[in-house]
C-alpha cells in the first residue's frame, strides 16, 4: 500500500518504475498469456516490494539494473516491431523484468554472478512460465557464442550488456545506461582472469552485438533511446555499392535472416507447422533441406521442441532412402549430445534435476531401446532399417559429447552382456556398431567384453552374424596385435557357405603381403557383389579383399577399379556404395593416367542418368577422383560438367553442382599432384566457383536451392577448405550473394536453404573480421557508363567494355530482357 501511495504522489521514475507494454500492444504476442500470469504473480508474491527492500538492506542496485534493462529492451523492441521485425513484445518485457530475479534466491556464500541464472530458471520453471524463463535464464554475454538466437534473446542480452553498475566518488553503486562501445570496456574490466583466449571469445560476442545494433539502426531504431526513431533506412542498389558497403549490407541481411528463421523455429505453432511440412515431404532433396535446418539450429530449440524433433527423426529411420536414414540417426545423436546446451550454466553443488523434466540420458536410453528393439508391429524391413542406423546414432553422439562419453556408453554396453539371448538381427547390428566405435571408447575391460560377445556369436547359423563377429575380432586384434586370443576366436568362426569369409580369415591371420586371388575367385566376387541376395556385409568383405589384392604390384587394378565404379552406380545398399567409393579412391594413385580417365568417364556417365537413386552417391567420389586427372583430362571433365549444368533436368544439374562443389573443396590437393603455373591453378579455381554461381542466378528454383546448399556446405562452411581460399571466394562472390538476399523466396524451402547458407557465410565473415584482419578490399575504381544498351553477342561492344575496364574503370552497363 505504501508503494502504491508513493506512485500516486510522485512522477514516474525510470530508475525504479517498470512500464510494461499496454494490453493493446500484446494482442498478437504468443507469450501474452504467460506475461499476464507473470504480472499477477509479481503482485501476489510481492516481488517488486522485495526488490525495493533489497535497495535498503544491500549495497547492490539490482532493481535499478532490472528496470534499466527492461527500459532498453522494450524501447528497442517497440521500434523494431515498427520497423517490420517479427517479435513477441510480451516475451521481451517478461524476460527483461525477470532476468535477474535469481539474484534474490542465491544463498550466502554462493557466487551470485554465476549462479543467478540457475535460480532464475527455477523461479520460472516452478511457475510453469517456461517460454519466458528460457529467454530470461539465458542472458549471459557468453550465450552469444551460440550462432543463432531469437530476436527476443538478442534484445535481452543487448540491454543487459548496456545497463551496468559503476561506482561514484564515495564508492557506491550507480546504475547507468552505456553505449555499446562503452559497455564493452566496462565489462572487460570486470571479467575474471582475462587471457588472450577469453578476450578473443569476448570480442566475438561483442561483434555479434555490434552487428545486431547495426541491424536495429537499419530498421530505424534510435539506439541512443532518445525517441528519434525513423522509418527503416532506404536500401542502396547492390550494383551501386562499394565492396565495404556490400559487406555491411550482407552482414545485416545475415542477421535479419537468422532472426526470421529463429522466429519460425521458436514459436510453438510455427515449429509444429515446420515439422508437419517435413513429414509430408517425399522428395529426398527437399527433405534434406529440412534436416539441414534441424542440424544447424537444433542446439537452440527448447527442450520440448527437441523431444518433438527426436520423435520426428525416429520416424525417418524408416525412410526408403538410406542417406536420409543415416542423416536422421546422426542428427538424433547430435541433438541428444546437445540436449541441455540451451542451459549450460553453473549449478549449485546441492542442485537436483527436476523430476519430470526430460534429460539427455533419459532420451538416450529411450531411443537406444527403440532402435535396437523396434516395435514388433512394424514391417520386418522397417525394423531392419531402424536397427541398421544404430552405429550412426552412437558414432554421432560420441563425437559430440567430449568428456561425457562414459555416461552414454554405460547403457549402450549393457546390451553386450548376454549374447546368447539375442536374435540374429540384433546381434549383427551390435557387432557392426562395436566394430566402428572410436578408440577411446574401447578400454581394456570393454575389449574383453566385446571379445566374449563375438566368441559367443561366432558359431551362429546366420552368415551375417559370423561375418560381423570376424570383422569385430579383426578390429580388436589390430588394437592389440600381441594378444593371441583374437586369433583363437578367429579359428573358431564357422566359414561354411562363404569363400570370402575363409579368404578374409586367412588374410587376417597371415598378415603381410596379401596372396594373389585366382581369376575364378575374382570372377565369383564380382558376381556376388552384383547380386541383391548377397548380404551387404559380405559385399564389404569382398571389397576389402579386392582392395588388398589391388595393392599388389601385379594386381589387376583397372579391372577392380571398374568394378568398384559400377558398384557406386548400381548397388542397392548405401553402405556398399560408400565402401566401394572409398576403395576406389584408395586405388586411384595406382592407376595410370589413361585408366583414371576411363574410370572418371564411367562415373560421369552415371551423372547423366538423371535418376536420383543412382546418381546421388556419385558426386562425392567423382569429385575427389577427378583430382587425380592431369590438367588436360580435368579440363575435359569440367567442360562436360559445365554442359550438364545447362541441362533441363534439375536432378542432373544438382548432381553436377554437387560434383563441382566437391572438386572445389578438395582442390588444394591438386597442386601437389600436378604442379602448374599459379595463374592456371587460380584460373581453374575461379572457373569452378563461377560454375556454382551460375546456377545460383538461374531461373530454376530447385537448381538455385542446390547451389545455395553447395556454397554453404562446400565453400564457406567447409572444414577442409583453407581460410585463404574462402576469403578469395568471398571477395569474388560478395555482391552476388547479397543480390540473392533481395530475391523473393518462392516457398518456405528456398528460405531455409538461403538461411542455412547465410548462417555459414555470417560465421565466416565474423571470424575473418575479428581474427584474420578482415577483407583486403581494393580502393573503389572510377565509374564508366556504357551508353545505350549493351549487346553481349556483339564483339565490338565486348571489346569496348574490356578496353575501358583494362584502363582501371568499373563499367556499368544495361542489358535488355532479350539479351
Identify the role of each PLM range.
Residues 1-37, 57-87, 98, 108, ...:
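Divalent metal-dependent phosphate-bond-processing catalytic cores, especially two-metal-ion Mg2+/Mn2+ enzymes
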Residues 51, 69-73, 86-127, 133-143, ...:
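His-Asp-centered metal-binding catalytic motifs of divalent-metal-dependent phosphohydrolases/nucleases
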Residues 271-275, 312-314, 364-375, 411-416, ...:
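Buried hydrophobic core positions in alpha-solenoid tandem helical repeats
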Residues 287, 325-326, 383, 387, ...:
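Residue-level detector of extended alpha-helical repeat arrays and alpha-solenoid scaffolds
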Residues 296-304, 334-342, 393-404, 415, ...:
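Residue-level signature of the C-terminal ends
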Residues 674-682, 698, 704-819:
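Nucleotidyltransferase catalytic core that binds NTPs
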Residues 282-283, 320-322, 379-383, 419-423, ...:
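Short inter-helical turns and helix N-cap capping residues of alpha-solenoid HEAT/ARM repeat scaffolds
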Residues 288-295, 329-333, 387, 391, ...:
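Hydrophobic core positions within HEAT/HEAT-like alpha-solenoid repeats
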